Amino acid sequence: HLMRIVWHGGEPLLYPNKLRDTMPSLLEIAERRGIPLETQVVTNGVMATADILEFLSGYNLGRLQITLDGPPEVHDSRRYRRGTKAGSFAEIHSNMLAALNQGFVQRIDVRVNLDIQNQGKLERLFAILAADGVQDNIHLSLGIITNTLPNESCSGGANNYFDVYGFSEDQAVEEYLKVAALAKSYGFQPPGELIVGPWCVARHPHAWTVGPDGEIYKCLSTVGRPEHVVGHLPEVPSNDAVTSYTLRRIADCLDQGCNMVPICGGGCLFEEKVNGTTNCPKALLQRVNAGLLTLEHGQ
């Protein structure tokens, strides 16, 4: 058994004192139940300073994920400060190196979101990181952006972004494998496999996403959407409905003889909601993973 706390956002490090207030209580709960505690942080990296990471390392900081969507000229055009429009690459890069050099983490997951905006523009990112000599300390997470639900409170929302900059399946496969090969050419270990479903919070019977006001969601992608709230702390709702549906989906996949079930888990429940149809990523998984196997082991 393991009690895993993943600080996610929005930006989870925006109010570091909230973490400082909460972590001792979470550790106390874990110790009272005799189970280890692991802490993870998924952050944009701007506020991943040595001060807060040193604090979190005292709570078994097992994973730090930051996002770099390209070299400075690309990343800073997408991820800049709200008021000044100043870029964030340099700050994130500095925080990454400090985290590794000071031993707060042994490895950093670098998330790179792939879309038409940064297509063919990622080589200098790998060149910069390779010059730092951190190839053995970087785990690459390549993300193919997907559609989402409209949000009336946010003009020009993420669903509109996908309509303009999202890839078709053929484009996604081609770009994913190109970027993986490019990373390998600079000494980084490319992703070993593309997985969807099995590691998702929505699939796990003892995993939940908790919002800032104690609201509980089953899917991370539904946070902030009141219609998807399934409960409120301290009461934890039943997970039976999701588990039952997941098992039925997996049974259907197995009946069809699909060999992707272990890395698919029946597909993404959120994408089913977005697209109004059963989500079956079989073709995408087969094509990308075949390419990754070839990249790793040759023909």
What are these regions (language model features)?
Residues P12-V74, R81-S94, V112-R124, I145-N147:
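Canonical radical SAM enzyme core domain
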Residues E73, S77-P205, T209-D213:
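Radical SAM enzyme [4Fe-4S]-AdoMet core and its adjacent flexible, acidic
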Residues H1-P12:
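Active-site groove signature of glycoside hydrolases
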Residues S221-Q299:
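Flexible mid-to-C-terminal extensions adjoining Fe-S/redox cofactors in radical SAM and related proteins
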